């Protein structure tokens, strides 16, 4: 899966229909997971509305659009659910996300920030959230600053 401008080497398989499903590896199972996991009408609209990153053209002449991978999609949904539950229960516990190098943590946080600021407006306690990203490397800090500034 990718966008119109995605280079071939960056296309990837959608290997789960729902969070918690086993990861598919056979070609037929991957095709089925892609069809059911991406192209069911409700899911497709959700992906199209909330999980495509468009870089602001003010910062670059290059047009950039990135669609989430399935782990980013399910992680964002799970984190949002955890944060909403925490706010409603006043537990003080939000969302924590740990990911391996190269798994798309920065984009996951961008997708989550979008969800919290645009899709949780009906939850008064969330309001206009302040989002803090804690990273352990300068490289991640610079990458995050660049991504959030350009989006």
Q: Across the structure, where does each feature detected by a protein language model lie?
A:
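ATP-dependent helicase/translocase motor core
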Residues: 1-135, 139-151
């Amino acid at each position: 899966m990718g966008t119109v401008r995605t280079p071939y080497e960056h296309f990837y398989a959608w290997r789960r229909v729902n969070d918690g499903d086993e990861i598919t590896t056979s070609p037929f199972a991957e095709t089925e997971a892609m069809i059911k996991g991406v192209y069911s009408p409700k899911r497709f609209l959700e992906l199209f509305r909330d999980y495509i990153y468009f870089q602001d053209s003010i910062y670059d002449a290059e047009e950039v659009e990135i669609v989430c991978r399935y782990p980013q999609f399910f992680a964002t949904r799970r984190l949002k659910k955890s944060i909403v539950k925490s706010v409603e229960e006043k537990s003080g516990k939000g969302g924590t996300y740990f990911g391996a190098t190269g798994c798309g943590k920065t984009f996951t946080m961008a997708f989550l920030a979008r969800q919290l600021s645009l899709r949780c407006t009906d939850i008064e306690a969330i309001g206009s959230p302040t989002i803090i990203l804690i990273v352990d490397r300068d490289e991640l800090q610079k990458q995050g600053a660049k991504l959030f500034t350009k989006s």
